[in-house]
Regions:
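Non-catalytic structural scaffold of enzyme domains
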Residues: 17-264
């Protein structure tokens, strides 16, 4: 019996196995503002990695957690220069620790996002960007914004949504802004969830919807602890979940073609 024919594969193109996956990028998290929402970031990120990779996979991440008592005091004193220095320091520490990119796990402290981004050599994933992209992908134009008074009243967040993404952003009136802000700082950051506060938020949301809001941005990472879809007649966009999932998207992104060639 003759030997079976042998076919050389030399020079042949191997089957396309799709984009080569890199080792997970290291997610750097600036947390503690408050730790209640930072815990949600950690939970969502690791759950998402496990869901995508299977088994007992989890995220490669670092967290620098600040003392929120000090942060809250400086916020209400209006000492944004010192707050900026602290956020820059946290980002630099994460970069030195091996983070590949950084998240500020809070909406309010994105007031100094540009300064933080300028202080490091790795990317800062801005919380407003994936949120706005989700809203636009869903076909909404006019949105209501809930958050701390700093987030609702200053331009750093609302202005970014309007200028960069072309959204029309509504904020509650002065009385409703005070209610939203006080519930965040007096209850949610301490892990207190009260039915009467949920009802108050429902009323604020209803007034925004009556003013034309097609969707509501939960623009404080603690608000998702209090309200859910059943509290609103229009879709809610939870910035905590959106930001955390965007971090996983980046951490698990396929290796760019140039990087793939260099690794071969």
């Amino acid at each position: 019996m003759g030997c079976p024919a042998r076919f050389s594969t030399k020079g042949e193109t191997e089957p396309d196995k799709g984009p080569k996956m890199r080792e997970q990028a290291v997610i750097g998290l600036i947390g503690g503002m408050s730790w209640e929402s930072s815990a949600e970031y950690y939970r969502i990120i690791n759950r998402e990695v496990r869901n995508r990779l299977g088994g007992v996979h989890s995220a490669r991440s670092l967290m620098w957690s600040v003392d929120f008592g000090e942060i809250e005091r400086l916020q209400h004193q209006g000492d944004w220069d010192e707050l900026t220095n602290r956020m820059k320091d946290a980002a630099i520490r994460l970069q030195r620790g091996g983070a590949d990119f950084v998240l500020l796990c809070t909406n309010t402290m994105h007031l100094m996002a540009d300064a933080v981004a300028d202080a490091i050599d790795i990317p800062l994933l801005h919380i407003a960007d994936p949120t706005a992209e989700k809203i636009k992908a869903a076909g909404f134009q006019k949105v209501g914004l809930l958050g701390t008074a700093f987030t609702m009243e200053q331009d750093f967040y609302k202005g970014r949504l309007e200028r960069v993404f072309g959204l029309d952003v509504l904020v509650p009136d002065a009385d409703d802004r005070r209610v939203v802000h006080e519930v965040i700082y007096k209850e949610l950051v301490a892990g207190e969830i009260r039915t009467e506060s949920r009802m108050a938020y429902r009323e604020v949301i209803a007034r925004l919807v009556a003013s034309g809001a097609q969707a509501i941005i939960l623009g404080c990472t603690e608000i998702m602890l209090l309200v859910s879809a059943e509290d609103s007649a229009v879709p809610l966009f939870d910035t905590t979940t959106i930001h955390a999932i965007a971090a996983v998207d980046r951490a698990l992104a396929p290796m760019p073609a140039a990087e793939m060639r260099a690794s071969q």
